[in-house]
Swiss-Prot record:
PANTHER family the UniProt entry points to: PROTEIN TRANSLOCASE SUBUNIT SECF, PROTEIN-EXPORT MEMBRANE PROTEIN SEC
Phylogenetic lineage: Bacteria, Pseudomonadati, Acidobacteriota, Terriglobia, Terriglobales
SUPFAM superfamilies noted in UniProt: Multidrug efflux transporter AcrB transmembrane domain
Encoding gene, per UniProt annotation: secF
Compartments where found: Cell inner membrane
Subunit details: Forms a complex with SecD. Part of the essential Sec protein translocation apparatus which comprises SecA, SecYEG and auxiliary proteins SecDF. Other proteins may also be involved.
This protein's name: Protein translocase subunit SecF
Keywords: Cell inner membrane, Cell membrane, Membrane, Protein transport, Translocation, Transmembrane, Transmembrane helix, Transport
GO annotation, cellular component aspect: plasma membrane
Function, as annotated: Part of the Sec protein translocase complex. Interacts with the SecYEG preprotein conducting channel. SecDF uses the proton motive force (PMF) to complete protein translocation after the ATP-dependent function of SecA.
BP GO terms, sorted: intracellular protein transmembrane transport; protein targeting; protein transport by the Sec complex
Transmembrane residue ranges: 15-35, 225-245, 246-266, 275-295, 327-347, 355-375
Length: 404
């Protein structure tokens, strides 16, 4: 399938427009990152994955309103919480990320209790929330009330009942009971009646609490940077052997260009960089490299066939010949990640945003950055006219070396 046939666009004739476009967006991103670094000490806004903090996973009985949750956090004095839904729309689950420097168990419990108090809009006076207590708390309460009048080993009996309550709540009801009466038929009626005296059920339950320490966040930051550099270095070596060194340099410069613009966009938009965003950046590096290799392959083939033409003409012709394939594959992928951005929920929003930006910039750079660099290199070396940049050929004596 071809979208365009016999196109004859002078891409290299527009190289100065391409250069201006790339410079504007690259410099804007770098200025934004520099200003942010001077102000906060980090070039980009980092998520809890990298700077450390507390992750609280909350399940709601009804569809949660993120605006109401954020307002409740603000009223409780919680500084700049990151709130997002996760799972499917019917899961009613929210992830709340808090900046928290301490990593002790006491700090974890304090963060959890603060969120519970913030979300309890109408707590029953003097009662405990059955959706947010563990089996030990329930056991101790039942032992103090002793509704079954146990004589022999009441601790073991009430521990068994408390475990049954927690298992039913978490495994069968998704962590949220709508009322204490839901326990009828699952535990003795006397136990239910005792619980109704001092317990109520809120419309939410804290499913899990995790702490990401600042040292772990720093380690993840270093690993993310190394992963990006290793991927670029590995691709450079591959293209060095697969093509000439200048091909590898051109492709890596294009990928670096894509990465700078994408990360700069996150800085300008004040969007957090998380581990999923790093995964998206590595993905777009591979995608951009693949797009560039398609163009390079065609340039290599045409260098062998059109030895009397200038390299600029060969590069132009090669870009035009691969234009249909480039736009078709990039367009379909772009529509996919755009749908993911619109419908994928807040958890995937950063990942999909990076891919949306990256695919657009990556497609552009394979045409307007990577390919023209071959011509710029030859002009810089002083080989003009019909002298063509060599392409890698597996056959002996099929390669013409560029002389210094």
């Amino acid at each position: 399938m071809e979208l365009f046939r016999n196109t004859n666009i002078d891409f290299l004739g527009k190289k100065w427009y391409f250069l201006a476009f790339s410079l504007v967006f690259s410099v804007a991103g770098l200025i934004s990152m520099g200003a942010r670094y001077a102000k906060t000490g980090t070039a980009v806004p980092l998520g809890v994955d990298f700077k450390g903090g507390t992750l609280v996973y909350v399940k709601f009985a009804q569809t949660p309103n993120l605006g109401d949750i954020r307002a409740a956090m603000d009223r409780s004095g919680l500084k700049d919480p990151k709130i997002q839904t996760y799972g499917g729309p019917a899961n009613n689950e929210v992830l709340i990320a808090l900046e928290q420097k301490e990593t002790s168990e006491q700090a974890l419990d304090a963060g959890k209790n603060t969120i519970i108090k913030a979300l309890e809009t109408n707590p029953a006076s003097g009662k405990n929330d059955l959706n947010n207590v563990g089996s030990t708390t329930i056991r101790d309460y039942l032992m103090s009330k002793d509704p079954l009048h146990e004589v022999v080993d009441p601790g073991a009996k009430y521990q068994q009942i408390a475990s049954q309550i927690v298992d039913y709540r978490d495994k069968e009801r998704g962590g949220v009971l709508s009322s204490v009466d839901e326990l009828q038929g699952h535990v003795p009626a006397d136990v239910v009646n005792a619980l109704k005296t001092d317990y109520f059920t809120s419309g939410f339950g804290v499913r899990n609490v995790e702490i990401v320490g600042p040292q772990v966040g720093k380690q993840l930051s270093n690993q993310a940077l190394l992963a990006t550099l290793y991927s670029l270095g590995g691709m450079l070596v591959y293209l060095w052997f697969r093509f000439e060194l200048i091909y590898g340099i051109g492709a890596v410069v294009a990928c670096f260009h894509d990465t700078i613009i994408t990360v700069g966009a996150f800085s300008l938009l004040n969007r957090d960089i998380s581990l999923t965003v790093v995964a998206a950046i590595l993905t777009l590096i591979g995608y951009s490299m693949n797009d560039t290799i398609v163009v390079y392959d065609r340039i290599r083939e045409n260098i062998k066939l059109l030895r009397r033409e200038s390299l600029a003409d060969i590069v132009n012709k090669s870009i035009n010949q691969t234009l249909s394939r480039t736009i078709l594959t990039s367009g379909l992928t772009f529509l996919t990640v755009l749908s993911l951005y619109v419908f994928g929920g807040e958890v995937l929003r950063g990942f999909s945003l990076a891919l949306v930006i990256g695919i657009l910039i990556g497609t552009y750079s394979s045409i307007a950055v990577a390919a023209p660099m071959l011509v710029a290199y030859q002009e810089w070396r002083g080989h003009r006219g019909t002298a063509a940049l060599p392409g890698p050929a597996p056959r002996k004596n099929d390669r013409v070396k560029v002389k210094a």
